[in-house]
């Protein structure tokens, strides 16, 4: 996970714990997430590691007939996050331990991340709603044909001034052990990096779903659910496709770890329906991509494209006569989404863990810690059951510490015990899903 992602996720949690404020994943995309921008929700999104949205090149205003322009988004003022982050540098506030913020030109030595919110005022929305939808707009036609749902950015959290972020802290040096060198992990873990975030950069946002009514009427309701569709139901095949995509989405409320476990099990069952050859080939495909985040993301896009078109696909390592059903594609897409949430270093550690056949132990470790603390919203140190680690040799234990440590779960051999930080939950959920898939595939192989 990049430093930018770490900061935006911590910010979203700090300002809106367990809420609907979505952190931005990519710095280069921030201009496409301003108020009124249209975005797409990624296929097989899950609230456990964050509903993920994809930029488009259009705003709501682009797809409306000409008419009155809305007033500028309302500035609701600066947040107190600046002072909280200042305090955290001294060790007292709940933001990532691995990030500090350094002021740049125009900021004092002690300045940190200062943010403000901009939101679409109700009167501005009323003004825009006087304009009809451009029903023949090619973008709208394309989205309707693909059964996509469109969302409108209604509120953003953005930087007030330019800041430079530096990664620092003990996480840099924890895992720079000799046996990691062949994996290329030392450079990706034990290093410093900095990123400059410009003034006015969107860090997090809220969306509401666009609803099309008839040919040119539209609305942006305050309350939505996963069963709602942007476009009126059309032909049957399109309806089936949308149901498939939304079927595994989580509701707005987490009941705890059990809900995550049931969701992962549902998707795993679809993978289990593949033949042994199919599962072995899928494992081979994924093993070649782990540690190559860009290629893994390309696979995710290809799978999304397959769902868009509603046809069967095959992966490179699969025999040509082994086709994937839409249900299988959806399940694989779910797990690939989880794996892309992990850093390249973690992905390489997963490959090493498969070689050493310690995935079951790692899965049990992650499962046990989340089962105990899933709804806990405060940091704490807790005892770890010794039997969770007793079967691991020294090298295997260090590898496991690194794998979970990069998701923010700090395991300490003395005790043994572990440090729980609620900010780590989304990353641990993604790691749990990734471990579950790989364990199933290695077992079948």
Swiss-Prot record:
Q: What is one GO cellular-component annotation here? A: membrane
Residues crossing the lipid bilayer are 78-95, 99-120, 163-179, 183-197
Q: Show the segment(s) annotated as Triggers pyroptosis.
A: 1-251
Q: Identify the stretch annotated as signal peptide in this record.
A: none
Where is it expressed, tissue-wise? Expressed predominantly in the gastrointestinal tract and, at a lower level, in the skin. Also detected in mammary gland. In the gastrointestinal tract, mainly expressed in differentiated cells, including the differentiated cell layer of esophagus and mucus-secreting pit cells of the gastric epithelium. Down-regulated in gastric cancer cells.
Instruction: Locate the residues binding a cardiolipin.
Output: 9-13
Q: Which domain of life is it from?
A: Eukaryota
Does this UniProt record's set of keywords contain Membrane? yes
BP GO terms, sorted: defense response to bacterium; programmed cell death; pyroptotic inflammatory response
Q: How is it modified after translation?
A: Cleavage by S.pyogenes SpeB relieves autoinhibition by releasing the N-terminal moiety (Gasdermin-A, N-terminal) that initiates pyroptosis. Palmitoylated.
Give site residues, (Microbial infection) Cleavage: 244-246
- Molecular function, one GO term: phosphatidylinositol-4,5-bisphosphate binding
Keyword terms, alphabetized: Cell membrane, Cytoplasm, Lipoprotein, Membrane, Necrosis, Palmitate, Transmembrane, Transmembrane beta strand
Q: What is the effect of changing residue 245 to N?
A: Abolished cleavage by S.pyogenes effector protein SpeB, preventing pyroptosis
Q: What does the domain comment read?
A: Intramolecular interactions between N- and C-terminal domains are important for autoinhibition in the absence of activation signal. The intrinsic pyroptosis-inducing activity is carried by the N-terminal domain.
Q: Which family does it belong to?
A: Belongs to the gasdermin family.
- Protein name (database record): Gasdermin-A
Species per Swiss-Prot/TrEMBL record: Homo sapiens
